[in-house]
Amino acid sequence: MQLIDGKSLAHKVQENVAKEVEELKQVKNIVPGLAVLLIGDDPASHAYVNMKAKACERVGFYSITHNMPDTISQDEIIATIEMMNANPRIDGILVQLPLPKHIDTNKILEVIDPKKDVDGFHAYNVGRLVTGLDSFVACTPLGVMKMFEEYEIDLEGKDVCVVGASNIVGKPMASLLLNANATVTITHIFTKDLKAHTSQADIVVVGVGVPGLIKEDMVKEGAIVIDIGINRIEDGSLVGDVDFKNVAPKCSYITPVPGGVGPMTIAMLLSNTLKSAKQRA
């Protein structure tokens, strides 16, 4: 069993981004810029945004965070996004999810200029991904693909089970795998027999937010398991969606939680923002 070390890979990605940022500054006098919209006072969202701001600083980005109260109107959010769309210093716009209940998330995401949609959530970019065209791709699935690449895991012809069909993780993950010529099964809350699908798969990718959902008897010997789940349990520790202790010995590769997929998400956000800045150049 080999651990896939997301922490060290994310560090490597960030180092490469920092080098390219320095070159972009020297040659084109361009500093990549990321704007983040943070609405309300959800502690987890604030923690994520702080991590993103620190990462931007480390690689030499310009970054700005718009903190807004959860009483804000949809029109005010739209006006702020439109202002950032028009700002030439901003290459990436990120709206921290989830949004308050009175806000239509899809409508907000659709206002973002697709060329600045570094989270890859705009329908334009989703459509390009599905059809196999170059696009901005959601950062977590993109991070998983980077892991496969780094560890030289060949996806062609592999049976892959994606557990979870969210717009943010499951669906883009399935599209990326399909584009890499894997045979993809997507399971979700209405799937009758989850084990029947996961136990046949060469690779299981899970991201549903249910601690310990994937048990030892649900994966085959030698499988590759990618755990995207991050759950804080009663004793305060972070665990994934996989029963790591019992599943890991059966795997050829597995990602730990924490230190697996999580760090890759921010690394790929930086990578996407750099990509946008280079298009500006």
From Swiss-Prot:
Recorded GO MF terms: methenyltetrahydrofolate cyclohydrolase activity; methylenetetrahydrofolate dehydrogenase (NADP+) activity
InterPro entries: Aminoacid_DH-like_N_sf, NAD(P)-bd_dom_sf, THF_DH/CycHdrlase, THF_DH/CycHdrlase_cat_dom, THF_DH/CycHdrlase_CS, THF_DH/CycHdrlase_NAD-bd_dom
Chain positions recorded as NADP(+) binding sites: G164, A165, S166, I189, I230
Coiled coil segments of this chain: none
Catalytic activity, as annotated: (6R)-5,10-methylene-5,6,7,8-tetrahydrofolate + NADP(+) = (6R)-5,10-methenyltetrahydrofolate + NADPH; (6R)-5,10-methenyltetrahydrofolate + H2O = (6R)-10-formyltetrahydrofolate + H(+)
Keywords from the UniProt entry: Amino-acid biosynthesis, Histidine biosynthesis, Hydrolase, Methionine biosynthesis, Multifunctional enzyme, NADP, One-carbon metabolism, Oxidoreductase, Purine biosynthesis
Domain of life: Bacteria
Oxidoreductase found in the keyword field: yes
GO cellular component terms attached to this protein's record: cytosol
Annotated metabolic or biological route of this protein: One-carbon metabolism; tetrahydrofolate interconversion
SUPFAM superfamilies recorded: Aminoacid dehydrogenase-like, N-terminal domain (SSF53223), NAD(P)-binding Rossmann-fold domains (SSF51735)
GO term, biological process aspect, one: methionine biosynthetic process
Cell cycle is among the record's keywords: no
EC number(s) reported in the record: 1.5.1.5, 3.5.4.9
Record-linked HAMAP family: THF_DHG_CYH (MF_01576)
Similarity comment text for this entry: Belongs to the tetrahydrofolate dehydrogenase/cyclohydrolase family.
Function: Catalyzes the oxidation of 5,10-methylenetetrahydrofolate to 5,10-methenyltetrahydrofolate and then the hydrolysis of 5,10-methenyltetrahydrofolate to 10-formyltetrahydrofolate.
Complex formation: Homodimer.
Name of the protein described by the UniProt record: Bifunctional protein FolD
